[in-house]
C-alpha cells in the first residue's frame, strides 16, 4: 500500500516497530525492503513485547520463578490504558511517537492498520489534537470474532464504545472482505456509508518468477507456506490425514509434505508445540524447513507440485495467503471449514479441492483428490488457473483506494526533497554483549524438539562456540520422542572435533524427598534446585559465558546460574543465541 501511494505522488511516512522489536518475535526479512519506493520515509519505534524479552537478566524475579503467574499479571496490567491484551500498554508511547512525527512533518491523511487495535487510539488522538483526517484499514476486524464467528465483545462494552467513536470520526474504513464489512454495517449503522472493501491480494513481484514443474513419475511434493496458527487438534487431523492418504493411495507413495514459514514466536519459534507435533510425523515424509525470505518465495513454490492451504476460522477469515497460492497456478488443497471466506476467492479456481478439518479421514480424502489433480497437471490447466488468479493482483484494488484517499485529503503533498530512515523514536534497545566464541550452556526443563538442536547447534559450533546441554530428557531419546524419568539429570557436551559424550548423574541424595519436591516446588525452582545441588556442574557454571534457557521454565535456573557464575549472561531461546553469535561473527 505504501508503494502505491508513493508511486502516485504522495509523500509517505511509515511509522512501525524497530527491527529489534520484530527480531525477538518472528525475526526480520530485509529482502522485504527490496523494491520499496526510495521516497518512503521509515520511522522505527522502539517498543518491545515484554513477554518476549530474551535477556533473562532483565526479567523480574517473579517472571523467572513463576512464568505462568507473571504472564497472568502482565496481561492484566497491559489493559489498564487500552482494552487490548499485550498491546494496550503501548497506547501512550505510540500516540507520543506518531505525534512527534506529525509535528516534524504534518500530513494530509493518517492511515492506521489494526491489529493491534491500540492503533485506533492513535488515530483518535491525532484527529482530536491536529484535526487530521484518518482511515481505518482493518486487516482484522476488532468487534467481530473472525475465528469463531459472532461478536468478540458486547455492545456497550469499553471496546465497543471506543470503536464506535473511532468509526464515527473516521473519514473511511476499509475491510478485507464483504462478510466482515456487512458485520460492521449491522453493528455500526451510523457509520456504514464510510465502509468499503479493500481486499488483500498477491504481490506480482513475489511470484512472477515461479516456474511450476509437472510431475513425471517422481513422488509428489506438497507444501505449506505461511504463519502457522492452526489449533493443535486441527494440525493433528491434517497430519493424521496425510499419513492415512500416504499409506493407502498409490499416487502418494513416498510423497512428502513440507512446512515453511513461521511456526511459533519468540523463544518458541520453531520449537513450540506445533513444531513438536510436525516432528512426530517425520517418518511419513513430513518436515519443517523454517521461515522463507520474500526474495526466496518464488523458488520455494517452484519446488512443490501442490499447495496445502490450512486455515483457522470460517466465514470471516479470507487470509492473504490464498491470493499468493492462486498466483502460482499450482493445485491447491484447502483444509478449512466449508463456509470459509477463502472459498469466495477460490470458487472458480480450476485446480482446487476442499477438505474439512473435522477428521483425519476427511483430510485424507482431500489429499487423494488433489493428488489426482496434480498428476493431471499440464500447461493448459496452469493457464486456466492463472487466468482466475490474475484478477486478484493487489495493484488492481488500489486505484479505488487512491481515488478515495485523494478525495479525503483533497490533494497529496509534494514529494520531500530528501528522505531519512535514521529517526528513531523512544529509547533504542541495547543488545546484550557476548564474547567471541563463547562457552554456551543450554538448559531445558521440558522435552527438547529434535529440529531445534539439529538446526542451531551446528551453527554455534561453526562459529567456534563450545556448547553444553543440561536437560531432564536424554537428548538421544528426546530426538526419538522418548522421555527419561525425572530421577535422572542428563548432561551432554558438544565440542568441535569430538564425538558426543553423555554422563548420567544419579541424584540419590534427593530420592527420599523426590515426591515432596514434586508436590511443593514448581518446575522452574525444581530445575534450579537440582542443578544447584549437583556439585559436578560447578565447573560448567564457573566456565560458562552464556546460559540459554530452551524454554521459559528453565529461565529461573539460567538466571541463577548466571548469578553464580558472576560473569555469564542468561538469555531465552536457541534462536536468540544463534542470532547473537552469528551477528557477532559477522561483525568480527
What are these model-derived regions, one by one?
Residues 179, 201:
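Carbohydrate-associated surface elements
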Residues 1-50, 172, 189, 245, ...:
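N-terminal subdomain of nucleotide-sugar transferases
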Residues 358-364, 375-405:
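A charged, aromatic-enriched C-terminal amphipathic alpha-helix characteristic of glycosyltransferases
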Residues 214-233, 239-242:
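Conserved donor-binding/catalytic core segment of Leloir-type glycosyltransferases
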Residues 171, 283, 287, 299-316, ...:
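Acidic donor-binding loop of glycosyltransferase active sites
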Residues 249, 254, 258-263, 268-296, ...:
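Nucleotide-activated donor-binding/catalytic signature segment of Leloir-type glycosyltransferases, i.e.
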Residues 16-92, 477-525:
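A conserved catalytic-core segment of Leloir-type glycosyltransferases
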Residues 85, 99, 118-121, 125-129, ...:
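Membrane-proximal helix-turn-helix segments that form the acceptor-binding/catalytic region
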Amino acid at each position: 500500500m505504501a508503494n502505491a501511494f508513493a508511486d502516485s505522488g504522495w509523500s509517505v511516512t511509515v511509522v512501525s516497530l524497530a527491527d529489534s522489536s520484530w527480531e525477538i518475535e518472528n525475526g526480520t526479512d530485509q529482502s522485504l525492503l527490496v523494491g520499496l519506493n526510495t521516497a518512503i520515509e521509515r520511522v522505527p519505534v522502539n517498543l518491545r513485547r515484554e513477554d518476549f524479552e530474551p535477556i533473562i537478566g532483565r526479567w523480574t524475579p517473579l517472571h523467572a520463578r513463576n512464568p505462568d503467574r507473571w504472564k497472568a499479571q502482565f496481561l492484566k496490567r497491559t489493559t489498564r490504558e487500552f482494552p487490548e491484551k499485550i498491546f494496550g500498554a503501548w497506547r501512550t508511547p505510540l500516540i507520543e511517537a506518531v505525534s512527534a512525527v506529525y509535528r516534524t512533518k504534518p500530513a494530509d491523511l493518517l492511515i492506521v492498520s489494526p491489529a493491534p487495535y491500540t492503533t485506533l487510539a492513535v488515530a483518535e488522538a491525532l484527529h482530536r489534537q491536529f484535526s487530521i483526517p484518518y482511515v481505518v484499514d482493518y486487516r482484522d476486524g476488532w468487534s467481530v470474532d473472525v475465528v469463531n464467528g459472532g461478536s468478540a465483545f458486547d455492545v456497550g462494552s469499553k471496546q465497543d464504545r471506543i470503536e464506535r467513536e473511532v468509526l464515527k470520526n473516521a473519514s473511511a474504513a476499509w475491510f478485507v472482505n464483504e462478510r466482515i464489512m456487512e458485520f460492521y454495517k449491522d453493528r455500526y449503522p451510523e457509520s456504514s456509508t464510510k465502509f468499503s472493501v479493500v481486499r488483500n491480494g498477491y504481490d506480482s513481484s513475489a511470484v512472477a518468477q515461479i516456474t511450476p514443474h509437472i510431475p513425471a513419475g517422481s513422488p509428489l511434493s506438497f507444501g505449506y507456506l505461511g504463519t502457522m496458527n492452526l489449533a493443535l487438534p486441527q494440525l493433528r487431523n491434517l497430519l493424521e490425514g496425510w499419513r492415512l492418504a500416504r499409506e493407502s493411495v498409490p499416487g502418494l507413495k513416498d510423497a512428502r509434505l513440507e512446512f515453511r514459514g513461521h511456526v511459533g514466536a519468540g523463544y518458541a519459534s520453531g520449537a513450540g508445540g506445533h513444531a513438536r507435533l510436525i516432528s512426530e510425523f517425520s517418518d511419513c515424509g513430513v518436515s519443517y524447513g523454517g521461515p522463507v525470505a520474500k526474495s526466496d518465495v518464488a523458488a520455494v513454490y517452484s519446488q512443490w507440485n501442490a499447495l496445502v492451504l490450512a486455515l483457522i476460522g470460517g466465514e470471516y477469515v479470507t487470509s492473504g495467503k490464498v491470493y499468493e497460492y492462486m498466483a502460482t497456478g499450482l493445485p491447491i488443497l484447502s483444509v478449512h471449514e466449508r463456509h470459509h471466506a477463502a472459498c469466495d476467492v477460490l470458487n472458480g479456481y480450476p485446480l482446487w479441492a476442499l477438505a474439512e478439518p473435522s477428521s483425519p479421514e476427511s483430510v485424507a480424502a482431500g489429499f487423494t483428490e488433489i493428488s489426482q489433480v496434480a498428476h493431471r497437471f499440464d500447461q493448459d490447466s496452469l493457464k486456466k488457473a492463472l487466468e482466475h488468479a490474475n484478477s486478484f493482483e493487489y495493484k488492481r484494488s488500489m486505484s479505488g483506494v487512491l481515488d478515495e484517499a485523494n478525495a479525503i485529503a483533497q490533494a497529496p503533498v509534494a514529494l520531500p526533497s530528501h528522505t531519512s530512515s535514521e529517526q528513531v523514536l523512544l529509547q533504542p534497545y541495547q543488545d546484550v554483549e557476548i564474547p567471541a566464541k563463547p562457552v554456551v550452556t543450554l538448559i531445558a526443563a521440558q522435552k527438547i524438539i529434535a529440529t531445534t538442536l539439529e538446526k542451531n547447534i551446528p551453527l554455534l559450533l561453526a562459529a567456534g562456540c563450545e556448547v553444553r546441554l543440561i536437560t531432564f530428557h536424554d537428548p538421544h531419546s528426546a530426538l526419538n520422542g522418548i522421555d527419561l524419568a525425572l530421577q535422572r539429570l542428563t548432561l551432554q557436551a558438544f565440542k568441535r572435533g569430538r564425538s558426543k559424550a553423555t554422563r548420567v548423574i544419579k541424584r540419590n541424595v534427593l530420592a527420599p524427598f523426590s515426591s515432596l519436591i514434586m508436590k511443593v516446588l514448581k518446575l522452574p525452582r525444581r530445575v534450579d534446585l537440582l542443578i544447584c545441588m549437583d556439585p559436578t556442574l560447578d565447573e560448567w557454571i564457573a566456565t560458562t559465558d552464556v546460559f540459554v534457557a530452551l524454554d521459559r521454565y528453565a529461565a529461573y535456573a539460567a538466571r541463577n546460574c548466571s548469578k553464580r557464575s558472576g560473569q555469564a549472561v542468561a538469555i531465552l531461546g536457541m534462536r536468540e543465541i544463534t542470532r547473537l553469535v552469528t551477528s557477532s561473527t559477522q561483525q568480527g
